Amino acid sequence: TRVSVIEPEYCYPQPVDLAVVRKVLTISEGKFAVSDINGNIVFKIKGKIFSIHDRRLLTDAAGNPVCTLRHKIMIVRDRWQVFKGESTEEKDLIFIVKPSSMIQLKTKLHVFLATNPKENVCDFRVEGS
């Protein structure tokens, strides 16, 4: 079964390898691009590096807002909350991402949909290479 977490126009019928590349780094702002294996930019990530509210905006290649990522530092584990568009309101929460364990040699993340508030079992897993 297919599950569309973000808008369907950003879904591919087959698995796609994507890479996050730092495009420009200044003292106050970091910009990243997400590209496919051919180097085509699929998404852009914009956000302030040094700010009280650690937020990033994910846009498509044309600059249309897709979702907002908000970093929350917790006592036990860091987490990222992902919201629809440019919102950070709880009603627009799509999912939460957190590391599968505190110490990792290879990035492994657990994704919990907003409909899974207890976070006992993750809805998806993401592994880096």
What is the role of each PLM region?
Residues T1-S129:
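Intrinsically disordered, low-complexity proline/glycine-rich segments
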